[in-house]
């Protein structure tokens, strides 16, 4: 570690002419720990030199401090992976979305779509505050992130159905400062995207404030084909929609955040976020379908325009209420206005028959979330954490369509949807010499209501669920570097609104969606076992699911070629998974690898037979970073998955290889990162095949993920700790650690 300190020296009285030259050529080398260096960097240094007759007094005062260090980017603590962002190349990649693309253990499967290897899509938190509807991937800057914590085994503290958790811990300024930073990310794929933004930050005493503005234009072009096969008694109907799906969006986002640190143990955060987005999607399709006697060609143009305005108010409080007690409280309230216009224009090439429909969907969401956590100590060295969560969604929706096949009640209706989930949890934990154990449970009560008014009818329905979801963990550390752990967790999959809606919504002339009022909740019990020896972790995970809810597509009427998509309770399923991860530093090179092998056990009905999903599949992630110098870092991230089966879904193999170079220039004022994504052009996670009853449907084609991304961030000004010197002469003292 090298600390360069610009020093002002002042001579008060001397007769020795050579002392000046000696002081200006002074080069001090001191070995210290990182903690010592941090403390010294905050203190003015006074040095006194004396001669026999006269004395020389000079002040050494710090103007700027440059710290260069290397440490492992990621480490494992129990079931949690901690990724150090501050001080690494990850903190210089622009925004959170750019950072997650290069983060070890994370797979990118689509635009702002990320998965934890072996666990699936995570739930996001920022400083412990649950993220609900905000777009954090472009608004949170990577330079403001201290670390991210990836929890692979979320317990009763988190909402039911949480596969994994990513908690983003931001940096808290320690000194009075003011800064203005500019950012821009330009991405060149089939279509060009750009995200310029600026962030103004100020810290004075106990108050910290920031104002961020983001403008984003995003373009995406997927080239894929949707297919459907219906097995009739005497023939097979097949349709293929060759589709160019072009989506373009424009958004403006303003975030105003304030932190008040009343004391080192009490912090209040207030955040306001406004987001405006216009999105246009254009599908140009050639539809080919074959029935018993003929082949029909149709030209289809589908357009969707969406206008969204969102206002979000967030609050969180963290405080120490006693010697061994802590309180965390967060609240989040969003108002979302969403207006969607959808058109479908179908023209038969042979007969020139045209079928045009217009659908309007105007809705307003009110979304409120409150989370509470309280840690305290009990007798017999037992630690306890209790808390709760309240989640409320109120959705008012007006739906109208001109589709010819829709019935009178289906053509227009007004819907009011309410979903309330109240939860409370309690966790008890105890530590012995080398054993840590935790046991707890989460109780959740849900109340879902729907009220639909059509032209001629009114419909009301409600459903309540009440569930207790236990969890337990044991960690045994027989010696340093060796750790064994076991976890158990139960989660629930609720029916939601589709479990109450009786009406159908037509997508086009050959398909529609429908609700299912007969749905039951699904439950999953997961047992996990891990062994860690230094940098190597091995794991085994078993899960059993009852009544899992999945969307299926089938043909309910053999006299037509129209398919229906609806949610159903599937048969019981089992999953066996073997997990391995390894992290190691080799000088300037850091490697992180994660791999998972999964064996499913599931059966479903297709073409009158019972089909079994039992093929072994693999997925993984390999990450390399090389510290070239204090100014340049090279990195690469490779994610892969093999052919895999999940319930009645089959997904083809896919991979995503990215590589990049990150540079810090102009005394760290300018950061540049150049990233190449989907280098092999194999990140086609949209190659899917669904089978159920008499119908097979899915997609094949290519995603728009291959391209080049250039991210820039520039600090216009940043006033940190500054101590004025007392002499005009300046010198650099190098401290090497």
Residue ranges and their predicted role:
Residues 50-89, 109-111, 151-152:
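Short, acidic, small-residue-rich periplasmic hinge/interaction motif at the N-terminus
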Residues 207, 253-278, 301-453, 477-483, ...:
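Face-selective signature of the C-terminal outer-membrane beta-barrel domain
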Residues 97-130:
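Extracytoplasmic beta-strand/coil segments of soluble accessory domains associated
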Residues 367-370, 520, 526, 537-595, ...:
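Outer membrane beta-barrel strand-and-loop segments of large Gram-negative receptors
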Residues 413-419, 463, 492-546, 563-576, ...:
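Outer-membrane beta-barrel signature, preferentially recognizing the C-terminal barrel domain
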Residues 96, 102, 129-155, 198:
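Short acidic/polar hinge/loop motifs at secondary-structure boundaries
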């Amino acid at each position: 570690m090298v600390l360069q300190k610009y020093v002002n020296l002042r001579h008060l009285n001397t007769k020795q002419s050579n002392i000046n030259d000696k002081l200006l050529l002074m080069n001090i080398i001191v070995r210290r720990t990182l903690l010592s260096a941090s403390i010294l960097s905050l203190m003015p240094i006074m040095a006194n030199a004396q001669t026999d007759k006269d004395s020389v007094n000079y002040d050494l005062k710090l103007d700027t401090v440059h710290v260069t260090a290397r440490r492992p980017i990621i480490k494992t603590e129990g079931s949690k992976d901690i990724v150090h962002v501050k001080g690494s190349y990850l903190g210089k990649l622009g925004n959170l979305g750019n950072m997650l693309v290069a983060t070890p253990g994370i797979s990118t499967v689509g635009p702002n779509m990320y998965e934890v290897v072996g666990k699936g899509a995570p739930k996001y938190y920022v400083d412990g505050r649950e993220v609900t509807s905000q777009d954090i991937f472009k608004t949170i800057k990577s330079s403001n992130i201290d670390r991210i914590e990836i929890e692979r085994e979320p317990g009763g503290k988190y909402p039911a159905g949480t596969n994994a958790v990513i908690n983003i811990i931001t940096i808290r300024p320690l000194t009075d400062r003011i800064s203005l930073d500019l950012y821009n990310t330009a991405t060149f794929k089939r279509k060009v995207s750009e995200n310029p933004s600026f962030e103004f930050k100020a810290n004075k005493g106990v108050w910290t404030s920031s104002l961020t503005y983001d403008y984003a234009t995003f373009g995406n072009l997927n080239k894929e084909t949707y297919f459907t096969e219906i097995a009739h008694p005497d023939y097979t109907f097949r349709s293929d929609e060759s589709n160019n799906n072009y989506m373009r969006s424009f958004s403006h986002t303003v975030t105003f955040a304030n932190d008040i640190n009343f004391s080192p143990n009490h912090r209040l955060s207030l955040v306001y976020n406004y987001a405006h987005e216009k999105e246009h999607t254009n599908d140009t399709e050639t539809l080919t379908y074959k029935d018993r006697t003929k082949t029909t060609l149709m030209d289809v143009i589908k357009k969707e325009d969406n206008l969204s305005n969102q206002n979000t108010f967030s609050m969180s409080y963290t405080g120490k209420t006693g010697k061994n007690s802590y309180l965390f409280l967060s609240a989040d309230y969003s108002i979302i206005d969403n207006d969607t216009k959808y058109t479908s224009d179908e023209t038969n090439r042979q007969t020139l028959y045209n079928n045009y429909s217009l659908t309007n969907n105007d809705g307003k969401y009110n979304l409120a979330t409150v989370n509470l956590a309280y840690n305290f100590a009990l007798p017999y060295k037992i630690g306890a954490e209790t808390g709760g969560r309240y989640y409320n969604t109120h959705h008012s929706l007006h739906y109208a369509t001109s589709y010819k096949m829709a019935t009178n009640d289906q053509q227009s209706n007004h819907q009011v949807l309410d979903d309330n989930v109240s939860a409370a949890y309690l966790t008890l934990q105890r530590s012995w010499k080398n054993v840590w154990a935790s046991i707890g449970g989460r109780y959740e009560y849900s109340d879902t209501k729907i009220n639909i008014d059509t032209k001629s009818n009114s419909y009301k329905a409600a459903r309540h669920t009440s569930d207790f979801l236990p969890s337990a963990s044991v960690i045994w550390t027989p010696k340093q570097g060796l750790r064994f752990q076991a976890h158990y967790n139960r989660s629930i999959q609720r029916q939601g609104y589709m479990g109450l809606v009786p009406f159908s919504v037509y997508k086009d002339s050959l398909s529609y969606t429908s609700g299912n009022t007969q749905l039951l909740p699904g439950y999953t019990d997961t047992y996990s076992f891990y062994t860690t020896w230094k940098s190597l972790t091995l794991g085994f995970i078993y899960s059993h699911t009852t009544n899992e809810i999945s969307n299926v597509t089938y043909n309910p009427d053999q006299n037509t070629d129209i398919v229906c998509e609806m949610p159903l309770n599937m048969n019981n399923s089992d999953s066996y998974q073997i997990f391995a991860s390894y992290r190691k530093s080799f000088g300037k090179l850091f490697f992180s690898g994660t791999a998972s092998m999964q064996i499913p056990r599931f059966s479903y009905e297709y073409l009158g037979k019972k089909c079994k999903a039992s093929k072994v599949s693999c997925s993984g992630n390999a990450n390399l970073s090389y510290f070239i110098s204090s100014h340049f870092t090279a990195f690469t991230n490779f994610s892969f998955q093999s052919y895999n089966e999940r319930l009645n879904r089959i997904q083809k193999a896919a991979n995503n290889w990215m590589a990049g170079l990150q540079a810090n220039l102009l005394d760290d004022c300018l950061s540049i990162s150049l990233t190449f994504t989907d280098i092999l052009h194999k990140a086609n996670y949209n190659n899917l095949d669904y089978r159920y009853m008499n119908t097979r449907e899915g997609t094949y084609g290519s995603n728009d993920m291959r391209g080049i991304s250039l991210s820039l961030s520039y600090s216009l000004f940043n006033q940190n700790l500054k101590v004025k010197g007392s002499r005009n002469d300046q010198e650099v003292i190098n401290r090497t650690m």
